[in-house]
Amino acid sequence: MTEPDYLATLTTDVFPRVELPRSPGGVHRRADGARGPGGGGAHSKPSRFEVLGDIALVSFGRYGQYIVTVVTVPLIARVLGAHGLGLLAIGMSAYFIGSLVVDLGVTQFLSARVPEINARKGTRLREMNQLRGDYLAIRLATATLFGVALAVAFAVRVPEAAQMVLLGLFVGGFWSLSEDWLLIGEGRFGTSTAYQSVGRLCYLGLLVGLLPQLPNPHVALLCLLLSSVPTVALTWWDAWRRYGAPARPRYYGVVLRRSVPVFVSRLLVTGYGQGAATLYSAVLDAVSLGLYSAGDRLVRAVQSLLDAIGFALLPRMARRGDHLGFWRYSTQALAVTVAVAALASASLWLAAPQLIRLVFGTEFAASTGLLRIEVLILPATTVTSFITTAILPVRQDTSGVLIGALLGTLVAIGALLLTVWTRSVHTLVYGLLLAEITVATWHLLRMRFLARRDHAEADTVPLPVVPRKETRP
């Protein structure tokens, strides 16, 4: 079976690294200002207002659940208490794992390829719809398995924590059925935000209306599931309108096999990051996880705003990916993002006692110390998020992501084993901090290595030999 064009250049590294050109210059915007294949004219530099606007749109669109959660978390904390919030933390961490397992963690890589596929006018629809069909088959099959497992779990009445894990896996998996990756790849952040805002508002209304009447952590996750339905439907309506129906899946096995490095690395990162509560639920009680979750929700809300910078810059980075100015632009953007993260970390540290008391109430006073430890991860998570979202996908360096994830996982495993002995939630937080610092350090070193390699390759390109005219005597 011949592989499709969109897979023809794939390597065992999942997606090929984009090579730098052998001569100065780069992608240029067409003289008429339209988007499309490179044309004549000088390279058009996006204004700061355009970049900030895209960041704001992605912040609310892609990570809106955090913003809505911050608005509703006082209600959740006071209705469910520390024990209920701990169970919800288990479900929400499983939500992120389920989302990752369904979409294979390759949405950023696929988004980075959308401009490339759309530039090939003759085969654009055929390639895009084949990719959509193969990707849908994988996601739909996995989400269905989660749904069956959830139904069986409720039928046999498994323990409450296990129910929350399976419910979270299914809710996260359903969310990953959306075609939002296409919108991000096309740079249509306003459209993405509009569609997702519908779901966020539905979640807010459902939570406020149902949770006080049915004070149960299951209800909070079910509200999130129901609110995902209109967003998923709208993204599919948009994709169908622009590209038509997805093609019959033919190469899903190839996509699965070659997505393994990215999937494994993302799963490892999620395991010691957003999915930590699911893993630590085996050694910590729900109350301890509830205290941890209180501070973690605030930290993740801020982190989501910082993560959005990388997503907003991804299409621009992809357009800059084939000229030497890419690394200078990347370094400047990373430095600014880390500075913002450091400022946010310091602000949260100072305001921790007031925030915990205001948002969660006096029952969660013990969360203050945990919050002050966890806010220190923000600069590190910002480094990792920016490099793995806006730089490595453009350079198609999946091995760098995998190695970083392995390093973080080794540290997290050590912290988990230590937690078995200490039975202290502080061990969880310190382990998370050390893991994030380790991974961020690795990615900075990896970024430096790739930049030096690309510059070395560009510097060693031989100049063309121009024959001299012979002078006759």
Residue map of PLM features:
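Signature of the first transmembrane helix
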Residues: 3-5, 11-17, 21-35, 47-107, ...
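Membrane-interface junctions at transmembrane-helix termini in multi-pass inner-membrane proteins
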Residues: 172-195, 378-406
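Interhelical loop/hinge segments that connect adjacent transmembrane helices in multipass membrane
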Residues: 31-47, 51, 193, 217-224, ...
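Hydrophobic alpha-helical transmembrane segments
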Residues: 162-172, 193-242, 407-411, 425-449
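Transmembrane helix-bundle signature of multi-pass secondary active exporters and lipid flippases
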Residues: 92-100, 292-311, 344, 374-381
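Membrane-water interface segments that mark the loop-to-transmembrane alpha-helix transition
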Residues: 54-69, 91, 100-155, 324-345, ...
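Helix-loop junctions and terminal segments of transmembrane helices
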Residues: 103-122, 298-324, 391-393
